[in-house]
Each structure stands twice: as C-alpha cells, then as structure tokens.
Swiss-Prot record:
GO terms for biological process: cell differentiation; negative regulation of DNA-templated transcription; negative regulation of transcription by RNA polymerase II; positive regulation of osteoblast differentiation; regulation of transcription by RNA polymerase II. The gene is ZHX3. This is Zinc fingers and homeoboxes protein 3. GO terms for cellular component: chromatin; nucleoplasm; nucleus. It comes from Homo sapiens. A zinc finger (C2H2-type) spans 77-100, 109-132.
Length: 956
C-alpha cells in the first residue's frame, strides 16, 4: 500500500462533496442517481469518497502532498446509507428501486431559465446541449412537494463559459433528507490484471488556477455540477492520451473509455492530440508520470467536417457498452444496434467516429484485426483464397447456370460474377468469430465443363449445417488447387473441421432417418459403430433433423441431372449484406431429402432464384389491382406476364415472384381451412344421425359451444377453436372416407404420420364406451374433491358409474389437462355446488316438502328459504336450484302445449329471480353446456325459444 502511494501517479484525490437538504424533511435516507459508464474505483479512492461523504467540510480547499490537483474527470454517485457506489445509471437505478422502496421512479426535471420540462435526465441533457451549449455549470435545486421529486435547474451568471455543456449529475432523489453527490476523479493505477484494460484520456489542468479554488464551497440547498476546467482562448480543450505504460493493451478495451470532449458549434476548431499506438503485447509496465498535452502533437479537426452529432446518443446504454467493448463495430454489431436503439446506421457510424475522436483512438486495419483477435481470444481461421475445381457436372455450361447451384450448395456465402470474367464465380465466404462477422475472404471458383465419362460415379456435394469451407468429393479423384501458402492437407485438416461430418457419415445418418425418424437404441448403437460418432451426436443430429423437417416447409431439393445429385443439409437461416462490389444475394438453406420433378425444379429457379423469403413494403392500390388480375388468370405467371407486370407496376421481378408466392400460400391456406370446415361439418352431421356425439370427440370439443343453445353446426364451427388433436382426428376421418393414404396439410417429413395412424387404430376402443349424464356427474363430483384419486377412490367411482378402470383413469387425465389449460368450464360451478338440472340428488321426503311448498306458493320467498333448508337438510343454493328446475319444467310444458298464459307470469318470474339471485341463469351461463334432460311432463323436443329450455349437456 505504501509503495503505491509513493508512485508519481496520484491514487488519493480530494473528493468534492456537495450536500443538498430538503428543508421540510431532514431525517430520511439520501439517494442519488448516477450518470456515466460503470467504473470500479481503487480502494483508496473509495475510502476517500466515504470520508468525504461523512465530513464534507474537511475537503474544501485541500490539496495533495505532491501538489497534484483533482482533474474531476468522472462522477461517483453513492448511496449514503448502504455504501453503494456506481458510475452506471442503470445499475444505480436498479439499486434504488430494489433497496429503497420509498424511491420515486418518476422524477421531473425543470429548466427554470427556459421553462423546459423533461421526464428523464437524458431529455434534460439533450436540452442543455441544444440550448445551453456555452454553459459550463448548472445549479440544481431538488425538492419533493406532494411526494414527487422535482429537480429545478438554473444557470449561474458567474459560471458561464464556452467550455462544456453541463450534464445533469443526478436523475432524482427521494428528497426526504439530504442528497450527497461525491465527484471524484477516476484515475486508477494500471497493473498487470486482466480487468485493468482501459484507455485513459485526461484533461490538462490549467496551472494558473489556485489549488484552493479547486473545491469551492456551495450553499446549502444547492449543488453545482461542473465539467471541465478553464477553456483556452479559442474555445478548444486539449486532450492527451495516456502512454502505453498506463494502459495495458489499448486494443483490448474491456473497460469504459474515460474522458469526454464537447462538440462545439460549427466553425470552432477543436484540438485533439492523437497518438497512434501499435499493438502492445504482454509486458511489464513501469510507473511513470502522466504525459501532458504539451508533450504530444496536436491535430486540428474542424467540426464542420463532422456531420450533425446527436448528444442524446451519449446516454444510450447499448451504444456505451458496445463502444466500451470495442471502438470499431462490425457490420453485424451496427445492424444489432440499429434494431435496439432505433437510430439509423449512418448516425451510429457518426457517433462511433466522434467517440473515437474524443478518445484519440486511431488504429490501422491491421491493428483493429489484431486487437479483435486478442480481445475475443479467438483464432480466426483466415484461409487464403483457394481455387476449387468442380468437375463432372452437366449444369456448368456457363457461370450463369451454375451460380444458383453454387449458392444453394454454399449456405451463407455470397455468390457473384466479377466483371471481365468469362466463366468464373466469386464466392465470398464470411468468417464468424463469436457471432461477429469478421473479414471476408473471397474464393474464386473455377467452373469447367467436362463431357460425360462412362463408369464415373456421381458427384455428391455435401454441405453440413456448420460447414465453413467447400468440400467437393469425387469418387474417382479429388482435385484441390490451393495457394502456395496453404496445403491441401492443411485445408482439409480434421483438427480444423473437427465438428464437420463427412459424406459417409451423413449418408448413413440420412439413410437411417428416412427409414425411421425416431431410432431405437440398437439403431443408434449401429450408427455409432458405422459413423464413429458418439451417441449424443447421433441423437442430436436426429433431433435437429426432425426439427427442420417440421419447420422448414416448402424447402426444395435439386436433381441437376442423371449423373449428379446435390444433398444439402439443413442449416439455420442466415442473411448477409455483401459489399457494394458483389451483387446482393441472400441465401436460405434447403432441407433436401425429397426429389422434385425437373419441371418443378426449373420453375423454382424462376420463382425464387436466390431462395430468399423477402418481405417488402406495402404496395400501392394500382399495383395490387394489376397483380390480383394477373393472379386470377394464372397463379404461376409466365416470363412474358412477369415482364408485363414489371413494366406496369414498376416492381422488380423478385418482388413480383415473392408476391405471387405469398398469394399462393394464402390461397392454399384458405382451401385447407375450408376442407377442414367441411370435414368437421360432415363429422357432426354423421354424429347426429347416429344419435349422439362420440365420447372422444365430445371431450376434445372446445369451449366455443359451452353454455350456448343448439344451433346449426356451421354457426358452432365459426366460434370454436379447434385443437391440433381435433384437426388430426378430422383429417384421419376424411382420409378414411375418401380412400386417400396421406393426411392433407402434412409434409412428407412430418413425424406425426405414425402417431396419427396409431391414433386412428385406437379410435374404435375409445369411442365404444359412452358416458351418461349421471356418470359424468359422479366423475365431476369426485374430480372436484381430488384431481389425483387413490386406488380406493377409483374402485368406488367404478362401482358407482360402472365404467372400466382405464376409462376412468383416462377421463381424469383429460380433465386435469383441460383444467390446466383453462378449458374446464364446469369446474367452478361444481366447486360452488351448482350442478346441472336434473342431476341434483334429493331424498324422497325432502322432495315432497319442496313439492308441497311449490304447489302452495308457486315461487320461492326469501323469508322461507332458511326454514326450507332446515327441514330438508339442503343448502340454500340447492333449494334455489330445485325451484329453478321446477319452474323451468313448467315453463317448457306450457310452451309445448301452446298455452303460454297458464304458466307463471312475468311478475312471478321476476320475483322468483329476485328472490333466488338468478341462480339458474348463473348455472346455465357459467358452467359447461349441460346434457339435454328429458322433461317429466312431456317427451316432446324442447322449445329453444324459452330462456331456460334447450340446454344441451356436453361431456367434459
């Protein structure tokens, strides 16, 4: 510790402490908010911050023993009562919200000079940069009227300088006591540690300023936030960059980049001292004095040469983190930042350029690549432009014919034809390092046309899902011409491509996959012996293959000719943006185990020549009319029609092809939906002819019909949500009826075919057992009591219902699944005791009591309810339900005989509903649809015009 303090680099800096108190509340904890990148402080600085926070007066006017004055390069915002310190706004706000529950999350920022109101400190920063660009300091008054934090900003006349635009130092506080902001320099002694890789930029102090004025005292109730020192005559700020001894490996910038340089108004020059540093390798550092601005050369950068700079981007956490990680973003990083920050790419480039100018960072391309390698600890395999000769392919008559073929065989590569070449293709191979695109190395691909030779085995070009190099394997010979700097053995070295599967391995795996998509243990062991892969790798390959077969519908395979075939493994969909020299081509991989007809293949080349599902902006009405009229004539337009549409709609051929493809998909989806509706309607009509719904189909019916009156099946179908199992069942039935062998809508690679066939075989056993309303009632009562019945419960319910044990077990499993997904509508009603009409079990004596009361009064009076409950030992809900059923039966009987005037009047019904709380309506609407109950008085069908009539019970 003593040796550190003897160093010429200061490690103990006086702390500037400002105390702000709220006059109305003095005994509550203090909190502040941060701004700026997160930074770890040395223990000495942290101790100084703590001491200064406890005794602010002790630091005023103090200096170090060595005479070094605080540079005040950064801000440290600390929470007084929990010793939490941070320089990151997001981290400190998270601490406030989680640890201090009385913290107000929505402070208000007011600029009193301009009457400007902002909800966030970023908004106030943007306002200051726009309207107060010449001010160097601001005074903030923080109050908390009506439990709401208000930060008022004023501009003192004595501090106005053209130096720096003030940044708000705190987002807000709870205002109940005092706000302590410690403002300390961030100067950390660089040691040989992995985390101490930072680029320091220090502002030069003006020696003419007295040391005692470095920490002026501020009045209570105000805090003054200052940035920067005195400005020079021309308004420029000198910035010096630390030497290589104070920063270990400037390329590997893991930490924040410290120091800021303001963006001055147009016309004012800005002096920046730039020191271009070569790559620094691991070495021992010797402490030496920090350099001054005079020791480094000055570079004048006119601000007029820099486009408009958006100051609001400085507070964006995504941008700051990306810049701190590496100051030179890649194309992929810029695309990601464009999405998450909503700023255009050009503005992001300007921001990164300005930040590099502020920090004095200027690296050559070689230094950037070297720094990126060291930062990510990744060896980027740069293959020097080998030339691969493809032989024995009938399609290589010209480069134009083979371009699509190469593009399909090389997923993730950009294929183009350079100018001035007769038959060559330029294949740009993007190299990825930890998900970031690195430099691209173009591979010139020589295409030759060789006549067919009898007896030569076909060429199989195999590209696996992780292939980054091209392997062209010929059964007779393998020709590989590489540059002198790399040999063919090194190019195809197994250590480089250890994760790639060979052609023989893929052939064995795909052959087994075509036989069975779910291999057994014996098959997996056989594949491990044949391919040499581990069991885990084999199972993972099968899992990935099944996933792509399910999700990559409509993928195509190509058979170029009789002697050649291309097998392309499925890979994730990746889109690349090539350079301006190469035509923009985006590749989508294909899942190829199915062969298409040659005519279909040719059509696919014309429809989507680059396999890209591209989405375009909305079209004008006249364009849509022209496209719709052409689609009505022919969904697959010819070349002449495409040319006519291009001239008429001013759209590219690619856009027209994409529109037609989407339109065909939409039409196919509508036709499939209609077929499903017709199948469902036929199924329901057949079920009605048989006299009732089958049990399995009834249990799969969704809640669209529940609680509704009987209506035509077409209306019911429009309201239901059909589950996938239901659709499978319907497709199976339609297939059996029409004598077809495959289910419509399912691809040939779908693994659901075998499962669907098994389900069809199990149908007769499941639908043979039908449950009555009483059986379902008993099952539901037990389900409400326990969802996981014991063996005794199963035996009891089997004895009561007469159902076999497998049927009861299956019913409970289906009910638990439906309850988990919120589709068990009757559960809440049974839980409250609201049973369906006709299923209420009442003792004969109690029934006579209720019958006598009903014959006497014709309605249930509220004052007699408790007396009836005591006599019958029934609950009030059950008594009300019995009266509702009784009145419903009488109403239906009156409706059947046509004498509506003999039933209870409207007033009586109103009184009954008032006394009973409209119990029956609640039961009918909130419960699952009930089974139709045969009335005692009549066997005629129910009249659905009655509000209580025609309720259909449905199974769970």
């Amino acid at each position: 510790m003593a040796s550190k303090r003897k160093s010429t680099t200061p490690c103990m800096i006086p702390v500037k402490t400002v105390v702000l108190q709220d006059a109305s509340m003095e005994a509550q904890p203090a909190e502040t908010l941060p701004e700026g990148p997160q930074q770890d402080l040395p223990p000495e600085a942290s101790a100084a911050s703590s001491e200064a926070a406890q005794n602010p007066s002790s630091t005023d006017g103090s200096t170090l023993a060595n005479g070094h004055r605080s540079t005040l390069d950064g801000y440290l915002y600390s929470c007084k009562y929990c010793d939490f310190r941070s320089h990151d706004m997001t981290q400190f706000v998270g601490h406030m919200n989680s640890e201090h529950t009385d913290f107000n999350k929505d402070p208000t920022f007011v600029c009193s000079g301009c009457s400007f109101l902002a909800k966030t400190p970023e908004g106030l920063s943007l306002h200051n940069a726009t309207c107060h660009s010449g001010e160097a300091s601001f005074v903030w008054n923080v109050a908390k009227p009506d439990n709401h934090v208000v930060v008022e900003q004023s501009i003192p006349e004595s501090t106005s300088t053209p130096d720096l635009a003030g940044e708000p130092s705190a987002e807000g506080a709870d205002g109940q006591a005092e706000i302590i902001i410690t403002k300390t320099p961030i100067m950390k002694i660089m040691k040989g540690k992995a985390e101490a890789k930072k680029i320091h930029t220090l502002k030069e102090n003006v020696p003419s300023q007295p040391v005692g004025e470095a920490l002026p005292k501020l009045s209570t109730g105000e805090m003054e936030v200052r940035e920067g020192d005195h400005s020079f005559i021309n308004g420029a700020v000198p910035v010096s960059q630390a030497s290589a001894s104070s920063a270990k490996n400037p390329h590997a910038a893991n930490g924040p980049l410290i120091g800021t340089v303001p963006v001055l108004p147009a016309g004012i020059a800005q002096f920046l001292s730039l020191q271009q540093q070569p790559p620094v390798h691991a070495q021992h550092h010797v402490h030496q004095p920090l350099p001054t601005a005079k020791a480094l050369p000055k570079v004048m950068i006119p601000l007029s040469s820099i486009p408009t700079y958006n100051a609001a981007m400085d507070s964006n956490s995504f941008l700051k983190n990306s810049f701190h990680k590496f100051p030179y973003p890649t194309k992929a990083e810029l695309c990601y930042l464009t999405v998450v920050t909503k700023y255009p790419e050009e503005q992001l480039k300007i921001w990164f350029t300005a930040q590099r100018l502020k920090q004095g960072i200027s690296w050559s391309p070689e230094e950037i690549e070297d720094a990126r390698k060291k930062m990510f600890n990744t060896v980027i395999q740069s293959v020097p432009q080998p030339t691969i000769t493809v032989l024995n392919t009938p399609l290589v008559a010209s480069a134009g014919n083979v371009q699509h073929l190469i593009q399909a065989a090389l997923p993730g590569h950009v294929v183009g034809q350079p100018e001035g070449t007769g038959g060559g293709l330029l294949v740009t191979q993007p190299l990825m390092a930890n998900g970031l695109q690195a430099t691209s190395s173009p591979l010139p691909l020589t295409v030759t046309s060789v006549p067919k030779q009898p007896g030569v085995a076909p060429i199989n070009t195999v590209c696996s899902n992780t292939t980054s190099a091209v392997k062209v394997v010929n059964a007779a010979q393998s020709l590989l011409t590489a540059c002198p700097s790399i040999t063919s053995q090194a190019f195809l070295d197994a250590s480089i491509y250890k994760n790639k599967k060979s052609h023989e391995q893929l052939s064995a795996l795909k052959g087994s996959f075509c036989r069975n998509q779910f291999p057994g243990q014996s098959e997996v062991e056989h594949l491990t012996k044949v391919t040499g892969l581990s069991t885990r790798e084999v199972r993972k390959w099968f899992s990935d293959r099944r996933y792509h077969c399910r999700n990559l519908k409509g993928s195509r395979a190509m058979i170029p000719g009789d002697h050649s075939s291309i097998i392309i493994d499925s890979v994730p969909e990746v889109s690349f943006s090539p350079s301006s020299k190469v035509p923009e081509v985006t590749c989508i991989p294909t899942t190829a185990t199915l062969a298409t007809h040659p005519s279909a293949k040719r059509q696919s080349w014309h429809q989507t020549p680059d396999f890209t599902p591209t989405k375009y902006k909305e079209r004008a009405p006249e364009q849509l009319r022209a496209l719709e009229s052409s689609f009505a004539q022919n969904p697959l337009p010819l070349d002449e029609e495409l040319d006519r549409l291009r001239s008429e709609t001013k759209m590219t051929r690619r856009e027209i092809d994409s529109w037609f493809s989407e339109r065909r998909k939409k039409v196919n989806a509508e036709e499939t939906k209609k077929a499903e509706e017709n199948a469902s309607q036929e199924e329901e009509e057949a079920a009605e002819d048989e006299g009732g719904e089958e049990d399995l189909a009834s249990e799969l019916r969704v809640s669209g019909e529940n609680g509704s009156l009987e209506m035509p099946s077409s209306h019911i179908l429009a309201e239901r949500k059909v589950s996938p199992i239901k659709i499978n069942l319907k497709n199976l039935r339609v297939t059996e009826a029409n004598g077809r062998n495959e289910i419509p809508g399912l691809g040939a690679c779908d693994p659901e075919d075998d499962e669907s066939n098994k389900l069809a075989e199990q149908l007769p056993g499941k639908v043979s057992c039908k449950k009555t309303a009483q059986q379902r009632h008993l099952l539901r009562q037990l389900f409400v009591q326990t969802q996981w019945p014991s063996n005794q419960d199963y035996d009891s319910i089997m004895a009561q219902t007469g159902l076999p044990r497998p049927e009861v077990v299956r019913w409970f499993g289906d009910s638990r699944y439906a309850l988990k997904n919120g589709q068990l509508k009757w559960y809440e009603d049974y839980k409250r005791g609201n049973f369906p009409p006709g299923l209420l079990v009442i003792a004969p004596g109690n029934r006579e009591l209720l019958q006598d009361y009903y014959m006497t009064h014709k309605m249930l009076y509220e004052e007699d309810l408790q007396n009836l409950c005591d006599k019958t030992q029934m609950s009030s809900q059950q008594v009300k339900q019995w009266f509702a059923e009784k009145m419903g039966e009488e109403t239906r009987a009156v409706a059947d005989t046509g004498s509506e005037d003999q039933g209870p009047g409207t007033g009586e019904l109103t009184a009954v509903h008032k006394g009973m709380g409209d119990t029956y309506s609640e039961v009918s609407e909130n419960s699952e649809s009930w089974e139709p109950r045969v009335p005692e008085a009549s066997s005629e069908p129910f009249d659905t015009s009655s509000p209580q009539a025609g309720r259909q019970l449905e199974t769970d």
